[in-house]
Amino acid sequence: MKVSKLWLREWVNFSLTEQELAEQLTMAGLEVDAVNPVAGQFTHVIVAEVLNTKPHPDADKLTLCEVNINKDKPLKIVCGAANVRPGLRVALAMIGAHLPGGLQIKESKLRGELSQGMLCSATELGLAEHSEGIMELSDEAPIGMDLREYLALDDHVFDIDLTPNRADCFSILGVAREVAVLNKLPLIEQPIVTVPPAIDDGLRVNLIHSEACPRYCGRIIRNLNLEAKTPLWMAERLRRGGIRTLHPVVDVMNYVMLELGQPMHAFDLSKINGEINVRYSASGEQLELLDGQEVVLNDNVLVIADKEKPLAMAGIMGGANSAVQEQTQHIFLESAYFNPVTIAGVARKYGLFSDSSQRFERGVDPCLQSKALERATELILSISGGEPGPVIESFDKKFLPGTVSFLFDTTKVKKLTGLSIPLNEMKNLLEGLGVVIIKETNHFFEVTIPSHRVDLQQDADLVEEIIRLYGYDKLQAQPMQTSVQAGLISAKEKIATHVSSWFSAKGYHETISYSFVDPELQEALYPQKEFMELLNPISSELSQMRAGMWPGLIASMIYNSHRQQTAVKFFEIGVVFDLDGGQLKERSCIAGLLMGEQGNLNWSESARLFDFYDLKGDLQSLFASLKLDDVEFIQSSHHALHPGQSAQIVINGKHSGWIGVLHPRLSDAFDLDQDVVLFELNLESLINPTIPLYKPISKYPQIRRDLSFLVDRQISAMQIERVIRNTVKEDWLKSFDVFDVYMGKGIPEDKKSIAVAMTLQDDTRTLVDAEINLTISAIIKKLENEFSILLRE
């Protein structure tokens, strides 16, 4: 934001030097990058009037001029500018004048004709980078007056780098508010005249998407003077604000934006068909912009349109098809409030940048639109004349930002900064910002935030405002005085930490993968699920939210296996996303996989590959560390797992996950030549709500009994274990292990032999053989009844 010091002083009468003001603004958070004079250094340049002209007798491109400088005798000047003419008031460098670049003006003869000075262009005076012809001054410019005084060129421009939260300072008014409160000076409000309508003409405004544009003000002005030109004072202020002049109407739009902070736009009324519609564009609509670029719009770009076509990209740039031009006689003025979320990012997406988009992205004052429209109308009428219609205002209160009010705890100033500031001083600083203090109760202020400060939403924001206005330099190094409460760690966080440490200790490597996955891989693993598609993915290979942990783990495993990793042990803890009836639900999971050789080369045993039981054993060990006793592995089928080597994991009677070997079909598709064993569990299922109780180690002997059964092949060891545990007296069965499974010679084809070992123990006494024998008999009888199992001798 470029701010003229003299323009700023019209709003607040300060007496600071340029350096002092720059330091003050920077310390208050408005960083001043540079302070530059508004014009080059020159002397003895005055306002003069061209009385008459005639061609140079010896040069076709030179003109002989008589110039009035309000002295007894006019001066003779030789000029080469094409725009020199009688009656024109110009900038004359007198004999002895020094111009930028070291040029000194002397009396001389050009092609034999006397020249007693030089008529200057804006470029020669350092007032513009490019200019055509000599500088043309207003007809009211006082002849003989020093040009620096007439144009107020003893001025400086402050180039301020604004942080994203200070959208309110994108105007002279906004910076003036800061200077006023910093120096405890009154803000000089500039009156805005309400212009009464001279005609009844208006346009219908339809807020089709009012959530994106909740307020739109407009006004027709007819019969502009086509000969009008932007006054020099306005052109100079625009130049100092970094904006070049284009057309009187457009210049007024830019002037009001610099002055008040409200971006505006003017349309050629003759190019508008019937009405104004504020809507999102249809995909594929095209619009040629003011800069000549033609853009193809997608369906999320807010546009200003008439009945048949888009006229402008709302808040970003107008269209060439409705632009104000030299022959434009009737105009429609726009002053609107656009939701910052709607504008943010759209300009960058299309490679566009404008002063309007910069302001709308950060948020303008939602109450400023009608005031800015009245100010623009007043200026246009004073420059170009015309007949204004009534102000048209359409709004949707539901989507307009509401008044922000809350209870401010003033003790937080001391808590957060360590600085003790009197309550009265805090009150004065806040009121200087425009904050209304409705009520004071003890150390609380009930406050209402002004509409232009969209960044003030909570206590911490007001603390920041108070301390920056009070002065960061008044902060002294001292220990902070505050109360600290230890944060509570949730049960899920504790489980995640335990599981991560446990797997790491087991030699697993933790992976962290994207929550976005390859849709082909995910759909191959979970064909029965729905998936959330990303609207704007990083790439086509990462276009779905993951519905399980396996896609990321398998992708990491494939990457490593293709790089000669002979043993892969991975686990990952993360969030998966289930799509349930169109609603996205998050779920925390733990998953892992094994592939390759188990262990290192060893002289005492041969190498082997990881199998189902390696991973199952690791999980059983994990469950034991978490004191989870009610865990079952129930043989079941999963689309991604081997039909004969897959199981559901049931914890405390609830389905909690899966374990198994990757389906051969998928192994072939992924070009894997070894089995991949993997599991996935809901993390919350590992939370054990029971409180562990102290229990001494039993001093009574353990008794082992081995039993061998002949069972149908489809009967699992888990089913046998469940029957045994339900039969043995509570707390007697200390362990249950399957130590042999045999199918083959001597065993019927539809049968198998399972041998199990049971360890029995009572914690209060020694078990006797009679009790043990009764228990074994009960087990055998129960198994015979349930599964027709036979005890092998």
Curated annotation (Swiss-Prot):
Residues 698-792 form the FDX-ACB domain. This is Phenylalanine--tRNA ligase beta subunit. It comes from Legionella pneumophila (strain Lens). Belongs to the phenylalanyl-tRNA synthetase beta subunit family. Type 1 subfamily. Its cofactor is Mg(2+). Binds 2 magnesium ions per tetramer. Keywords: Aminoacyl-tRNA synthetase, ATP-binding, Cytoplasm, Ligase, Magnesium, Metal-binding, Nucleotide-binding, Protein biosynthesis, RNA-binding, tRNA-binding. GO terms for biological process: phenylalanyl-tRNA aminoacylation. NCBIfam families: pheT_bact, YtpR. CDD domains: PheRS_beta_core, tRNA_bind_bactPheRS. It holds the Pfam family B5. It is found in: Cytoplasm. Gene3D superfamilies: 3.30.56.10, Bira Bifunctional Protein, Domain 2, Ferrodoxin-fold anticodon-binding domain, Nucleic acid-binding proteins, Phenylalanyl-trna Synthetase, Chain B, domain 3. Mg(2+) binds at residues 455, 461, 464-465. Residues 401-477 form the B5 domain.
